[in-house]
Structures are given as C-alpha cells and as structure tokens.
Amino acid sequence: MVIHSDEVPQEAQPERSMVLRRVINADRHSAAISVTWVRITGHHDRVVNQDCDRVYYVIEGAGRFQVGDGAPVEAVAGGDFVFIPRGTPYEFDGNMLYLVMNGPAFRAGSDAVLPRAL
C-alpha cells in the first residue's frame, strides 16, 4: 500500500503549536504500528505512555528532548532519532518537522499529561 502524504488530511492543534498528519494508524491500517508526520513550533506536553514504545525521527529543524525524570536535556536536529520506552516520561520543544512511530499503534487518550519540567 502506498500512502501519499499530501492525501492524508492535516490536523491543526494550535493549543499545542502543532500541525500533524496521521499517516498510518490503527483505525485504517494496523494495530501494530502508527506513524504521524508532525510540525511543531513550540513546546510538547510532558507525557508518559504505558501502552507503546515510541521513536521520533527529526527530519528537519532543531529542538531539545528530556527523556526520563531528572535526565539531561539533549539537543536534537535533522537526522537524529529519539527512542522513548513505554512508561518513560518525556517532553520536548523546538521548531521541527518529525515523524513519530508508535508500537503498538497509538490510541487517542493513552498519553497521560504530567507537570512540565522544561
């Protein structure tokens, strides 16, 4: 199956400084994996997900990630990957275009929002 990104509807989430496209998702494709294209221009909530492992791939731009309580804040840029094991709190900010992949697939409501650390 070929999925043309320009045929996937964009969703604006201005309260989160994000625009996204849910390219591969459990409702239409597979419960095993989800892939979302995202452009962010600000801060992403501190969250934890007990259901899935998550990988971020930064396509372009730059930002900062904190993965784990008390972990160092690390810079990321185009070409970098960030792995988030399930059950690990994290947050990030920046001006980036990235892909986020979840295994198993992301389910709405599965992220628990935590108090901000960055």
Give the residues covered by each predicted segment:
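Short, surface-exposed beta-strand-loop junctions and turns on beta-sheet-rich folds
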Residues: 55, 71-73, 98-99, 107
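Short, surface-exposed secondary-structure boundary micro-motifs
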Residues: 87-88, 93
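A short, N-terminal "cap"/entry segment at the start of jelly-roll beta-barrel domains
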Residues: 1-34, 39-47, 113-118
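A short hydrophobic beta-strand segment most commonly corresponding to one strand
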Residues: 32, 95-113
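Short acidic-glycine-tyrosine-enriched beta hairpin
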Residues: 70-87
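Histidine-centered divalent metal-coordination motifs
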Residues: 47-50, 90
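Short, conserved beta-strand element in jelly-roll/cupin
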Residues: 37-40, 49-67
